[in-house]
Amino acid sequence: IGLAFQIVDDTLNLRGFKDNLKSKGEDIAAGKVTFPIAKAMSRLPSNERLGLWKTVSSKPTDPAVIAAVIEQLEDCGALDACERQARQLVETAWQRLDPLLRDSRVKVILRAFGWYVLERSY
């Protein structure tokens, strides 16, 4: 669940948080190698990987450069792939945990927490 939370957080940073709680692309401006960046590295041709790496590691502040990086991550499918992977992590964890827990309010809350991790917008 923790890894899924982080993947969703990284993706939200690029797609935008509800009510603009954080600036879109803050992680790029900070030069952070997030899960979507790592995912893009496995999807992009080598020349684009190098360009992405150089851009992110330079900690860009120009909104146009940050927007171009986000567009590149969208275009290569990295953000959608991250969301699918987060969903799969939560579903797999639940499949393993479900038979071990007796039906209870706590079990329902735990399941709801897993859904929240995936569906949150802030």
Predicted features along the sequence, with ranges:
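All-alpha prenyltransferase/terpene-synthase fold signal
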Residues: 1-122
